[in-house]
């Protein structure tokens, strides 16, 4: 990251743009705080995981701010990769603070399928989720990040379906929306 920082300064002088951006994972591994939202300019590499977390934080906080206050009595479980667990706890706190009756049980899931060094949410499998979530009070629903599932199907990388996951754990499971406002509505139970 120090080398990239130095290179970015050079590029900014020459091109008025950082041009080179390390993925969010680099910051998580180095236990460094993610750069501020503005650092990512117009998010030219977000599909590659560059700025994705900071963008989610910003968008989710705006969605919470825009959502009208109301009494929510709901407990949801959201499994996540071990690598982003702490950051996601911080992001979920926006909703917890505004809706005190809302319980968000964020659960870090170890990736047994690909091995423990793989700690991203998008590579978790149905079996990994069953193994970890079977020890939890899951509440009203399990909410799944879209990155865990095949593009247009509710199937995990190990061919388990979301329906099979629900049946094994005895709680309905749903794919969350991709956008922050939709995710918040999924969490609140107000999604259409």
Model-derived regions, located:
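Generic secretory/membrane-interface signal
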Residues: 2-4, 18, 152
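Acidic side chains
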Residues: 2-5, 24, 140
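Radical SAM enzyme core and accessory elements
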Residues: 30-192
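Single conserved hydrophobic/aromatic residue that forms the stacking wall/gate
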Residues: 1-13
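Short secondary-structure junction motifs
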Residues: 15-17, 101
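A glycine-rich phosphate-binding loop feature that marks nucleotide/adenosyl-phosphate handling sites
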Residues: 17-30
